[in-house]
């Protein structure tokens, strides 16, 4: 009886102690999660404000102040504007690193093509695609300073859109009815801007929109045209890519002059295949809060193939045939990636430059503050005073 009673008492004491320890650990874990949540919320608010307002406003005002330089030296203007563009990309990389995203590259090493004239065509899965490409290409020569993006015009009238316009990026409208007029404007833009402002790469998503928005219509298009339906991407729209090669493509196999006659032609097509683990594209709002479904979900990948441009691709039918073949290959690459977790070939993990990203935050913060003190605040005060004087 005594032994039994002692054992019961000890068990109860041990049970109480274990329960207390478990409850203490649970409380500590809850506090830790709450602290991390607060840090994520503060960080997300900071980077959203910087990305959506501070950087665009500071960049646009600075570029506007630089415009008079073009009366004296266009190369000097281009040099300074390209430096600003590089710092914009450094900030975007800081956002990627903050949320915990990593990028691994497969296929051809693009370092040797950084200073060439190239057309990069990427599949479009989600809003994070921009971060994947920006982080991947950031450390490769002057690409990040001298690229021209072709972007859907939903962003055009936002501060980001104004900033991208000031750099010379081109916005496209959807719809068949506007196709000819948009492509005509794009051709004019390429002729007037590409060489004048010393661009190097043109980057676009030829599928037209994010995959989940065009997957059904893409399958219908394939079936209607007797093509094999693709599962992981859709056949590209060739209009914009053809416009690039029709204006900037080579006149002959010597690759010495572009078709518009203004300089060195586009020599390479960069076929970029972006992949997310198991095909699940993370939501950008969840990502900003650090809410990843798994550790692997934050590990992005991109596969590069480099194809020399052929002069005959200025014929849209021949270009279409080539691009359709490439997207069949792309579909197979993505199928393998979703199955195995990696693309074929050697891989290289992109290492971000932490010092540059920290400097970018200081740079844009100080630049915005200077513009606010000397331009924005007086303008706001004057506008408000003028408005009140009406009444």
UniProtKB/Swiss-Prot annotation:
Top enzyme class: transferase
TM region(s), chain numbering: 47-67, 84-104
Membrane protein topology class: Multi-pass membrane protein
GO biological process: CDP-diacylglycerol biosynthetic process; IRE1-mediated unfolded protein response; PERK-mediated unfolded protein response; phosphatidylinositol acyl-chain remodeling
Location relative to the cell: Membrane
Gene Ontology molecular functions: 1-acylglycerol-3-phosphate O-acyltransferase activity; acyltransferase activity
A Gene Ontology term for the protein's cellular component: endomembrane system
Span(s) of short sequence motif HXXXXD motif: 124-129
Catalytic reactions on record: a 1-acyl-sn-glycero-3-phosphate + an acyl-CoA = a 1,2-diacyl-sn-glycero-3-phosphate + CoA
Pathway as given in its UniProt record: Phospholipid metabolism; CDP-diacylglycerol biosynthesis; CDP-diacylglycerol from sn-glycerol 3-phosphate: step 2/3
Pfam families: Acyltransf_C
Keyword terms of this UniProt record: Acyltransferase, Lipid biosynthesis, Lipid metabolism, Membrane, Phospholipid biosynthesis, Phospholipid metabolism, Transferase, Transmembrane, Transmembrane helix
InterPro entries: Acyltransf_C, Plipid/glycerol_acylTrfase
E.C. number(s) listed in UniProt: 2.3.1.51
UniProt family annotation: Belongs to the 1-acyl-sn-glycerol-3-phosphate acyltransferase family.
Described purpose of this protein according to its UniProt entry: Converts lysophosphatidic acid (LPA) into phosphatidic acid by incorporating an acyl moiety at the sn-2 position of the glycerol backbone.
Domains (record comment): The HXXXXD motif is essential for acyltransferase activity and may constitute the binding site for the phosphate moiety of the glycerol-3-phosphate.
Record protein name field: Putative 1-acyl-sn-glycerol-3-phosphate acyltransferase acl-12
Native organism: Caenorhabditis elegans
């Amino acid at each position: 009886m005594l032994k039994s009673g002692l054992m019961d008492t000890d068990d109860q004491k041990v049970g109480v102690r274990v329960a207390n320890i478990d409850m203490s650990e649970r409380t500590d874990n809850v506090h830790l999660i709450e602290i991390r949540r607060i840090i994520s919320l503060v960080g997300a608010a900071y980077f959203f404000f910087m990305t959506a307002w501070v950087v665009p406003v500071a960049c646009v005002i600075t570029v506007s102040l630089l415009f008079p330089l073009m009366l004296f030296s266009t190369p000097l203007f281009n040099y300074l504007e390209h430096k600003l563009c590089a710092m914009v990309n450094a900030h975007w990389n800081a956002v990627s690193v903050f949320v915990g995203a990593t990028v691994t590259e497969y296929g051809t090493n693009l370092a040797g093509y950084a200073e060439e004239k190239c057309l990069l065509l990427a599949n479009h899965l989600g809003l994070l695609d921009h971060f994947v490409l920006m982080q991947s290409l950031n450390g490769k020569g002057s690409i990040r300073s001298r690229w021209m993006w072709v972007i859907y015009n939903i962003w055009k009238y936002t501060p980001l859109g104004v900033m991208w316009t000031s750099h010379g990026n081109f916005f496209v409208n959807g719809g068949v009815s506007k196709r000819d007029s948009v492509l005509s404007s794009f051709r004019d833009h390429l002729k007037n801007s590409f060489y004048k402002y010393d661009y190097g790469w043109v980057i676009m998503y030829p599928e037209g929109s994010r995959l989940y928005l065009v997957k059904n219509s893409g399958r219908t298009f394939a079936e209607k045209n007797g093509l094999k339906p693709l599962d992981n991407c859709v056949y590209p729209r060739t209009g914009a890519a053809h416009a690039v090669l029709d204006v900037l493509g080579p006149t002959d196999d010597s690759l010495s002059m572009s078709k518009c006659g203004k300089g060195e032609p586009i020599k390479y097509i960069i076929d970029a295949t972006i992949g997310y683990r198991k095909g699940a594209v993370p939501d950008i709002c969840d990502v900003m809060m650090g809410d990843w479904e798994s550790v692997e979900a934050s590990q992005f990948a991109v596969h590069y193939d480099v194809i020399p441009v052929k002069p005959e691709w200025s014929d849209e039918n021949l270009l279409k045939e080539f691009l359709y073949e490439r997207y069949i290959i792309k579909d197979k690459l993505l199928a393998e990636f979703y199955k195995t977790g990696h693309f074929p070939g050697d891989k290289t993990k992109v290492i971000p430059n932490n010092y540059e990203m920290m400097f970018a935050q200081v740079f844009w913060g100080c630049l915005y503050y200077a513009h606010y003190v000397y331009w924005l605040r007086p303008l706001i005060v004057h506008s408000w005073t003028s408005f009140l004087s009406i009444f």
